[in-house]
């Protein structure tokens, strides 16, 4: 009786499996063709979440059914092989009780394994059906809500998430814009501060000429000058020299910018480099422009001379640096060697800049090689 039942099941599964295989495969292929023709694979991610889930479920159900039928077929084949073994053993030794007992145990173990596999498949199928029912319940309209749109709740959740992400992106863009504006304001303030020094250029030149002629403000150790008067004169000279050095820093910055733009042609890179030097200048390094210009004159004198030949303003800037540097050096050298003003200003970066420029340019800014 058991053998007849197994034979009937085997015939039923073998005949129906082919139909299920063909139907499931056709279902999957038609689903893929439908998506390709009417929706497009590029529009999948623009679908709502429940639509994507239904699409995946539609394609995966026939595949799962094919796998289930395949496993059932394997189980039936295994049972048939066991049946064949039992028949063979029965024919070989029909009177052996030990062989019959062993076959019964083997069949019992195999039946338990088959039952476990069938139970697992039934549980998996039940879970798949439950997921499908939950998805349908989610897509179905609520009778108590009165909402005409069955996907209103899901659409509202998706809309709130999108608005949250948009708000975060707008906050980041606003913070970045504020940072850029703050950097631009800081840079504009530095440029305005440097430009304001140009207003004093003519007055400083006249003051230096007057001081060089009179020499009365130089704190020479004269008899009859008390320490307070000597300190006042040194302070006055230091203030004049400080204004002159600020003006020279502005001129050196302009000359350095003209030279770098002509040599490299990268205005953005030049602006970044000048901004770095400006930050160092306002941080306390008052000689940073002189030191950078000395390096360019020493290492790229040919390029600077070519720039001076083709640009009148470059020659004027070089001439201004040479004339003011010589006046400052003359004032400082007139001080007593032990005076603080001379100790601070003598043999500094400005001295090195004047020496480097004087080796390649005349007092009017004309290159020596072109004179």
UniProtKB/Swiss-Prot annotation:
Residues crossing the lipid bilayer are: 19-39, 52-72
Q: Which residues lie on this side of the membrane: Lumenal?
A: 40-51
Report the superkingdom from the record. Bacteria
- The residues forming a coiled coil are none
This chain belongs to which protein, by name? Liposome tubulation protein MamY
Misc. remarks from the entry: This bacteria makes up to 60 cubo-octahedral magnetosomes of about 45 nm in diameter which contain membrane-bound crystals of magnetite (Fe(3)O(4)).
Family note: Belongs to the magnetosome MamY family.
Topological category with respect to the lipid bilayer? Multi-pass membrane protein
> Keywords in UniProt for this one?
Biomineralization, Lipid-binding, Magnetosome, Membrane, Transmembrane, Transmembrane helix
Subunit structure as annotated in this protein's UniProt entry = Probably interacts with MamX and MamZ proteins.
Describe its function: May be involved in constriction of the cell inner membrane to form mature magnetosomes. Binds cardiolipin and liposomes. May function with MamX, MamZ amd Mms6 in biomineralization.
List the GO cellular component terms: magnetosome membrane
Query: What NCBIfam families does the entry give?
Result: MamY (NF040997)
Q: Which residues lie on this side of the membrane: Cytoplasmic?
A: 1-18, 73-371
Outline the inducing conditions: Expressed in exponential phase, peaks about 18 hours. Protein is associated with magnetosomes as they start to develop, rises to a maximum quickly (at protein level). First gene in the 4 gene mamXY operon.
Q: Where in the cell is it found?
A: Magnetosome membrane
